[in-house]
């Protein structure tokens, strides 16, 4: 499709492509240009597209079934009010989950798609064509959001089904989908803006995630610190989650009871305008930012004059016994702006610390944890996601730069390669690990946590750090495409956290009748186990990985129930066993054989 204007069907197959004068003045059929046209034509040809679409609908129905069993169990429900109450509850859960998924994967797909073009040096080829800035930027943006938009439309019948139960109006459903679509465009525009600006994949992913967290955190901070002001009203308008909350509870602010009063027009328009601003800047600066002027910096040299002659001497550095970890630690393998990302994480940590930890600690978030615990949890999850992104890009960058295959010709062993990558990841992200540990120490000094509980919490968090790093390396080695590796790795982390959060909500809802409704949670956990096993055993069908993928959701469920029952040691042990065993199950195959570590096992050769 991209080379279509250069093709002359009248020419012989033995001739080169001929460029006609009219092809230089071509007019694309779509305003996004041939990049989006190609994606729209090729995406439906992939079997994976239909599997993802049907799998997403299946997940929604599993979640709906679990919520129904949690609410009613095996009772014979005949009351209209009970059905309407369940319809409203199910709408709130599904809408919140969909908005969260849409925002995350819009950001992930857009950032990963453009970053892969840069890593493979194919973006420069696009810049050398007669494609305009608008066609490149909008084409990559809309092509990245095509899968997300398909999933949003595919889920519409599920939400319409909830209307038949009562408790939700069709207007609420439409506005909820409008907010989801606008949020997807906003997060995708932000990720595209960052991806065209930054050079390294890790910088792109980390800046995109930190920017989104800072955006949402700033809006919530304005609402919390200046309630009732114009700034708070604008912050509520620009926040996707607050817009969705107003759609879910239209009577919360004393609005009229008619369905026509439900509207999120201001929020949708505001997010679309902000998206247009980000996209417009990217279109205007595309060929200024790319290619980067820093790509062709010469190595450090010094000139010496002897007998009137000038010689240039290149400064060589001493390399360690393990060159992999030396490169990860002693060079700028991930760009020159990594320190800025660490400072941004520190700023986010400071804002969360000020807003939630130093705030009113008596308020319970969803009746589960205090504001201080919720702040720590959010900061820890952000750190784990960034560590995982660092790990998976450490492998995908090598593959895209065609340097991973060169390792086969060297004497570097699999252990040196894998341990070197893991050591570099943990060293480069040491601040992301230390800051939550320091906050745990602050909890102990304030008397919020006992010394015993703080030790359990620190051990559990360090275990999750190792799991996040190893999962990134495992996904990077197991997938041949960088986009698939990044999506699989970060998607697994994201689904684990979202699944845990939803499971905790359902457990609180079914606290009074948990014993009789365990089968509903069993279905939810089994679905998660199947997805995790498929993700972990994509390239290496190891029995240990199958066992780890099957046990991890069940042990996580046990840790959640133990936590809600005020358990401490049991929670720590279940987390260490579940995630520690999974980490070891991913590590051992990677360091056992060099072919396996490079993702080229004998299974691929038949």
Language-model regions, residue ranges each:
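Helix-loop-helix units of permease transmembrane domains in multi-pass membrane transporters
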Residues: 36-37, 113-145, 324-329, 395-428
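Transmembrane alpha-helical segments and their membrane-interface loop/helix boundaries
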Residues: 1-105, 112, 147, 151, ...
């Amino acid at each position: 499709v991209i080379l279509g204007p250069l093709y002359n069907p009248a020419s012989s197959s033995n001739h080169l492509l001929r460029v006609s004068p009219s092809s230089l003045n071509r007019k694309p059929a779509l305003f996004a240009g041939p990049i989006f046209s190609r994606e729209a034509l090729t995406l439906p040809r992939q079997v994976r597209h239909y599997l993802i679409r049907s799998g997403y609908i299946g997940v929604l129905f599993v979640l709906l079934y679990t919520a129904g069993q949690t609410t009613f169990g095996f009772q014979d429900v005949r009351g209209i009010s009970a059905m309407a109450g369940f319809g409203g509850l199910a709408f709130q859960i599904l809408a919140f989950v969909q908005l969260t998924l849409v925002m995350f994967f819009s950001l992930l797909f857009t950032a990963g798609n453009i970053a892969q073009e840069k890593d493979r040096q194919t973006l420069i080829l696009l810049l050398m064509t007669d494609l305009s800035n608008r066609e490149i930027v909008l084409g990559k943006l809309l092509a990245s959001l095509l899968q997300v938009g398909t999933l949003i439309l595919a889920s519409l019948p599920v939400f319409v089904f909830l209307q038949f139960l009562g408790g939700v109006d069709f207007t609420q459903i439409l506005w909820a989908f409008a907010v989801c679509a606008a949020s997807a465009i906003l997060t995708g525009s932000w990720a595209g803006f960052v991806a065209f600006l930054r050079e390294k994949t890790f910088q792109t992913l980390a800046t995109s995630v930190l920017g989104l967290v800072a955006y949402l955190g700033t809006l919530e901070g304005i609402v919390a610190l200046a309630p009732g002001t114009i700034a708070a009203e604008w912050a509520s308008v620009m926040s996707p989650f607050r817009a969705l909350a107003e759609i879910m509870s239209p009577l919360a602010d004393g609005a009229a009871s008619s369905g026509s009063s439900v509207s999120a027009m201001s929020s949708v328009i505001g997010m679309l305008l902000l998206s247009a601003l980000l996209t417009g800047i990217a279109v205007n600066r595309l060929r200024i930012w790319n290619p980067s002027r820093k790509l062709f910096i010469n190595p450090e040299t010094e000139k010496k004059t002897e007998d009137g002659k000038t010689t240039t001497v290149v400064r060589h550095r001493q390399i360690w016994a393990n060159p992999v970890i030396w490169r990860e630690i002693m060079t700028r393998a991930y760009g020159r702006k990594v320190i800025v990302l660490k400072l941004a994480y520190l700023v986010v940590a400071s804002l969360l610390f000020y807003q939630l930890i130093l705030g009113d600690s008596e308020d319970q978030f969803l009746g589960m944890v205090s504001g201080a615990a919720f702040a720590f949890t959010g900061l820890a999850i952000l750190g784990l996601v960034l560590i995982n992104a660092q790990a998976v890009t450490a492998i995908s960058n090598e593959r895209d730069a065609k340097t991973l295959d060169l390792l086969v010709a060297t004497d570097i062993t699999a252990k040196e390669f894998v341990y070197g990558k893991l050591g570099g990841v943990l060293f480069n992200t040491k601040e992301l690990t230390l800051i939550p540990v320091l906050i745990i120490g602050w909890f102990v000094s304030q008397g919020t946590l006992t010394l015993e509980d703080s030790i359990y919490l620190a051990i559990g968090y360090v275990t999750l750090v190792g799991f996040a790093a190893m999962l990134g390396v495992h996904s990077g080695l197991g997938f041949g495409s960088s986009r698939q590796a990044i999506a699989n790795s970060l998607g697994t982390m994201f689904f684990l956290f979202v699944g845990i959060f939803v499971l905790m909500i359902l457990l609180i809802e079914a606290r009074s009748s948990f014993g009789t409704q365990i089968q509903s949670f069993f279905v939810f956990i089994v679905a998660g186990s199947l997805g995790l096993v498929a993700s972990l055993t994509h390239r290496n069908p190891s029995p240990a990985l199958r066992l780890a993928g099957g046990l991890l959701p069940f042990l996580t469920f046990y840790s959640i129930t133990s936590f809600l029952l005020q358990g401490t040691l049991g929670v720590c042990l279940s987390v260490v066993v579940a995630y520690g065993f999974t980490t070891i199950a991913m590590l051992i195959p990677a360091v056992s054989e060099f072919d396996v570590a490079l993702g080229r096992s004998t299974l691929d050769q038949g």
